[in-house]
């Protein structure tokens, strides 16, 4: 250290405010202004900027109105559960606000036609299909450090294959290689993510642990680093099929907020994902309207302000699609009652997450 170290004196004889001022001035000389500041004076830390997830119910369940910018988010679940769909809806919502989004397609499986149907402006979406995990994370680091990207999706952690594994032979045992890669990348990325206010969404897959007798045998790939660095972790599951006559036209989906550093966790919400359409906004407005008491349900009939909307859920959804004014009115009322709804949304017990452990808020 070029500056002389502060002299340590007895607590009884020192003036704490003067000592603190001296320490702060030394830190600012050495590391620059703003290296240490009072939390309340840092406006950025007080105001959480969010982007809608594309699901009205999930935005309410998250407690802050959407997914937070400047943070790491993990979306995990079984195959075909809606992980990429949810991430693409977030991209579409960010683009509506004029944001720049990037998609690192490590799985080489992004369908631009499906993305366009979800509302993504594919002509404005930056995409990279890297050859190996190190390249993917270097590209992510460069994009985050630029400060120009609002949302960055990495799909998926399981597909971030280390270069050494690609160059090796089939059957080579390389234990912990991907976990070390993720741990190093997140150590580098985390400060840049906060400074650039970029939301980084990692999509992850589920694997089964062998020989587990108690708790959940499920675990996510890529080691434990992502679990610690993520501010929000979402567990998405398909819980049923939506049929039109005998044809399956969509999935009933449940999302549980397993970890949330910004609001109380463990809330869960259900919505419909329709094939070729994505998250069904009409279905959510109908379900949340019933929970908030804005839409009345009597038997199979749905009604609003004494006006019948239809018999059965699908007919009521069709009525909402045909009457955008009524839909907008119900949506405004739902948003005004979001505090009440947040309490009514089923709060799951802190069940064991995808690692057989009780999730912590950190």
UniProtKB/Swiss-Prot annotation:
Gene3D superfamilies linked to this entry: P-loop containing nucleotide triphosphate hydrolases
The family this protein is said to belong to: Belongs to the RecA family.
GO biological process: DNA recombination; DNA repair; SOS response
Entry superkingdom: Bacteria
Primary localization class, coarse: cytoplasm
Membrane spanning stretches: none
Gene Ontology molecular function terms on file: ATP binding; ATP hydrolysis activity; ATP-dependent DNA damage sensor activity; damaged DNA binding; single-stranded DNA binding
UniProt cross-references to InterPro entries, sorted A to Z: AAA+_ATPase, DNA_recomb/repair_RecA, DNA_recomb/repair_RecA_CS, P-loop_NTPase, RecA-like_C, RecA-like_N, RecA_ATP-bd, RecA_C_sf
Protein name, UniProt field: Protein RecA
PANTHER family listed in its UniProt record: MITOCHONDRIAL DNA REPAIR PROTEIN RECA HOMOLOG-RELATED (PTHR45900:SF1), RECA (PTHR45900)
Species name: Nitrobacter hamburgensis (strain DSM 10229 / NCIMB 13809 / X14)
Coiled-coil region: none
Function: Can catalyze the hydrolysis of ATP in the presence of single-stranded DNA, the ATP-dependent uptake of single-stranded DNA by duplex DNA, and the ATP-dependent hybridization of homologous single-stranded DNAs. It interacts with LexA causing its activation and leading to its autocatalytic cleavage.
Binding site for ATP: 77-84
Signal sequence interval, chain numbering: none
Localization terms from the record: Cytoplasm
UniProtKB keywords: ATP-binding, Cytoplasm, DNA damage, DNA recombination, DNA repair, DNA-binding, Nucleotide-binding, SOS response
Pfam family, one: RecA_C
